[in-house]
Amino acid sequence: MPDDSSARLARTAPAAVPPRALLVAMSYWPEPAGSAPMMTDLATAFAAAGTDMTVLTARPNYPGQRVYDGYADGSQDRLTVDGVRIERTLTIPPKGGGMKARLIHEGVLHGGFLAAQGRGRVARHAAVLSLCPSIFSVAVANRFRAPGGRHVAIVHDIQSGLAGALGMGGGAALKAIRALERNALNRADAIVVLSEPMRDVLRELGVRRPIAVIPPHVDADAVHPRPRPADQPPTVLYSGAFARKQGLEQVLEMARHLKSLRPDARVLLRGQGGLEEELKAQAAALGLTNVEFAPLIPKERLAEGLAEGDVHLVPQRPEGAAFAMPGKAVTILAAGRPFVCTCLPGSALARLEAEIGAFLSTPPDAPEAMAKAVADLLNAPDRRTAMGRRGRAWVEGNASRSAVLARYAGLLLNGDAA
């Protein structure tokens, strides 16, 4: 792949940003996966543009389902990082990932959020952002909105849809989550979703507030195309959480098929999470000598790490594919690399593939088809280069930090995301 690092975007601030703003979110720095990188970048972008920015969040615990070293005792519950004031509260990670564990985790955390308000630790704000998941964050954030202020709820996952698809909880629990989603979101002033299909699902749920579609964003200055390392074999890269909803079992099966198509290629799984040991055991049982595991790369070396992948992977379980637009997809496009994803017809990724032609999709749970798509790209370096350039161009026009910041600022100030 060519090195296009000289053609980076200049940072530009929007015409106006709120003087003060609050983000209520379970996910934030230093968590390296999930929604945390995107929320961290959004908050720091507001701070860099002049907003007095506060984040109310959990002690970092994802992926891995344990509070990070140095945070459990509360000594880092009040920090200022990159101009953003970070306020954290007691966190009990959801061991096991079931519905009961998640409810305990979210109940304790959001009770702490409300206590922070009651004790005067975090005040009401005229401009409030919240992140779903958790829908409890959205409900709590409504309490932090000052009279006459605006609250914008950012929906990355639709929890009732994902919970039902992944078998978490029974019918009564799902009905309760749907009712909470509908009520909490209808009390926000505006809602942001990542894709048109997500907007459609919220409308079907009974959400009637204005909904803007703003794709996942990335700091396109920090994440940019870099040349691949010259001394490595052809590399297929997955980077992210080792969690159930990623459907990583199909990646191992894909690697088994790829071994006969491209015996010189390696499949590098870089990440951490609750499924790590299970995945390693499965890879060993299948005799996958072409699969390697590695930890997530530090944020400051993200562009370098992404450059290692000739072809990237964005797997999803089919049941949850309609409810989420993976942020990692946009990050890969910013790095000028193509990827192969699993998605359903009409889903957010399927529509984006048709729009920009910068990646390939295969049906979920079809590892042989996924392996063929990966091999086809490995065999066509010129095609990979062209797809990478198209993906990068789309990010610069639609998903860069400056483009997205202007839209969020408009929603907070006057309800206009144009």
Regions inferred by a protein language model and the residue ranges of each:
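Membrane-proximal helix-turn-helix segments that form the acceptor-binding/catalytic region
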Residues: 124, 136-139, 143-147, 172-191
